[in-house]
Design a protein with these regions (language model features):
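Conserved ATP-binding subdomain of kinase catalytic cores across diverse folds
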Residues: 23, 29-32, 40, 45, ...
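An acidic, glycine-rich, mixed-charge low-complexity segment common to nucleic-acid enzymes
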Residues: 1-51
Length: 182
């Protein structure tokens, strides 16, 4: 990330100090594969940290979630906990997916911890500017935190939704046009 782009990110509140970095999460002790509901390997591995590191890691990740969702008001995150951390061994970013669980109502949410690079950050910023919806991310040196955006993974969408009626094809084309015009 160039100095100019870093200054832009700082000015618009995208650059912020976070309590844990991507490289800190790489030191897991064990991992087990994550399968989908049909028993197919998702290429994600649920990672397990040594007990002496786990509490510190979970606390830092919960704090990051609080930064994302409450603007830093840490008084409201006491009922949140990390339920699971998954590592994706496929793709160019090898992200960590963090599942946060609300102990009060058992609702969960996700966010991602990835290696930062200028093209990824630039792409997120352009998407944020062009999209009608706010896209939340934080960058700190070589780490980027991205919110989870609800939807269907592309490969599942292609397999299960594109083989449908002509009406849906027209509807899908209209959605792409709307997105392109934004």
């Amino acid at each position: 990330v160039s100095k100019e782009f870093a200054a832009y990110l700082t000015e618009y509140g995208r650059e912020e100090k976070i309590p844990i970095k991507y490289t800190d999460l790489l030191d897991w002790q064990e991992s087990i594969p994550v399968y989908d509901k049909d028993g197919v390997d998702t290429l994600w591995r649920s990672v397990i940290y040594p007990p002496h590191q786990q509490d510190e890691i979970f606390s830092a990740l919960t704090e990051i979630y609080g930064l994302m969702k409450t603007g830093g008001n840490m008084e409201v995150i006491g009922h949140l906990t990390v339920a699971q951390i998954d590592f994706c061994q496929f793709g160019n970013t090898n992200p960590f997916r963090v599942k946060i669980r609300n102990l009060s109502n058992d609702v969960h949410d996700y966010f991602y911890v990835k290696k930062a690079d200028a093209s990824r950050v630039f792409g997120l910023e352009v998407e944020h500017i062009l999209s009608p919806n706010r896209i939340f991310y934080i960058i700190d040196a070589d780490t980027i935190i991205e919110e989870h955006i609800m939807g269907i993974p592309c490969d599942q969408f292609v397999e299960s939704h594109l083989q449908r009626s002509e009406y849906q094809e027209v509807s899908l084309a209209k959605e792409f046009i709307k997105f392109n015009e934004r």
